[in-house]
Amino acid sequence: SGWTTLSLTRDFKAPDKEPLSKEQLQKFLKATPAIQSDSPEIKAVSERTVGSETNPIKKAELLQSAVFELIDKDVNRNSNTALEVLERKAGDCTEHALLFNALARAAGIPSREVTGLMYTQAPSPQFYWHVWNEIYDGERWISVDPTWDEVFVDAGHLKIANEDTIKIANSFGKIKIEILS
């Protein structure tokens, strides 16, 4: 029940290369019951959005901007699948991340969901729980936040877990952060 102090410094050095096995790549490319990247509707939106672009980072930029524009920011709209998000066109960060995952995978970009904390000034300076994505560019994972229309997210994003939010559920409501400057 003591305090842990964590100092964060923004490091502009590119992350180290992280080779993925074929099995790992397949895991982050495959459709799931929630991430319906193999559905005709998801494929059509993905193909229309990326067009003839082949660079995975540029594809991700196009997709995350499309998700940002498509979804009305509404914390009271919960969807369980990417197709529901596409149909309702509303939601919070979880819906943005869910739809982005499906569109990215449909475009052949390995992607995963990330859970963590995000700093914001509104309504007052503090950290909020947040969900965003990472794409694999063939060498390393790169953060993408379709809720805020950001590729290479800023230092205000504190990643806590990849994909499995259940593993960190016990932390919800227990983390306290004091912003010193």
At which residue positions do the language-model features occur?
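Intrinsically disordered, low-complexity N-terminal segments that are enriched in acidic
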Residues: 1-14
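A mature extracytoplasmic/lumenal domain signature
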Residues: 10, 115-117, 148
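Active-site rim recognition segments
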Residues: 15-25, 29, 33, 109, ...
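Secondary-structure boundary elements
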Residues: 20-91, 99, 162-181
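Generic recognition of flexible, low-complexity loop/linker segments
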Residues: 48-52, 89, 117-122, 131-132
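Cysteine-centered nucleophilic/redox motifs
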Residues: 63, 90-117, 133-134
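Catalytic cysteine-centered active-site loop
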Residues: 73, 79-80, 113-122
